Amino acid sequence: MKKLLLLLLAAILALGCAACAAKPYAPAGEGTGNVELDEQVLALLQELCDPKADLVTNLGAVYDFLCTGITYRATLADTSGGFTDELTNSLALELLQKRRGNCDAQAALTAVLLRRMGCEARIVQGTFLRADDPTPVEHAWVYAVVNGTGCWFDPLYGGHFAENPRDYFMADDARMALTHQWDAAAD
């Protein structure tokens, strides 16, 4: 009888614990429509984001991953026609699969992740300056609207050139203008 009661109690506790288990992160934004990309994006967000944390905290976790979990590889992408949804999705998927890519791919993945998290996000093209070289370098990064405020994300620059990578996380115009140039009329 004691064994039966203990088994019953263990079963009740197991069911109760399963009901109390933390729910996975559920992003607020919509997917891209590319099934493979959307599955990988959701899996990554569920790995990186805390369902109990606020949006900015989770954006920080995603940004930190982009700064440290992706390797820069100098390649060329044909962006002469702009960042169409097809190009953005293709670059983002390739970067997720290989974990290495150029600034275009990093900007594409950043935009896809931010959109999936419920933020407006668009890729911006321009140039940046390195401290050791006055020659402008062609570059791409992301402008987003987070909680109603416009800000900039550049995990490639932050992770490779900045003294403090977080300087390019939700950066304001003044911060970005120190190192980046873009067509402000396009904003």
Language model regions located:
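Hydrophobic/aromatic-rich core segments of domains that either
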Residues: 105-174
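Sec-dependent signal peptide cleavage junction
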Residues: 15-31
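Active-site nucleophilic cysteine motif
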Residues: 58-62, 99-114
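Positively charged n-region of N-terminal signal peptides that target proteins for export
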Residues: 1-4
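Short, low-complexity, Pro/Ser/Thr/Gly-rich segments in the mature regions of secreted, periplasmic
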Residues: 176-187
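A glycine-rich, coil/turn loop motif that links secondary-structure elements
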Residues: 9, 81-82, 100, 129-133
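Secondary-structure boundary elements
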Residues: 31-97
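Bacterial N-terminal signal peptides
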Residues: 8-16
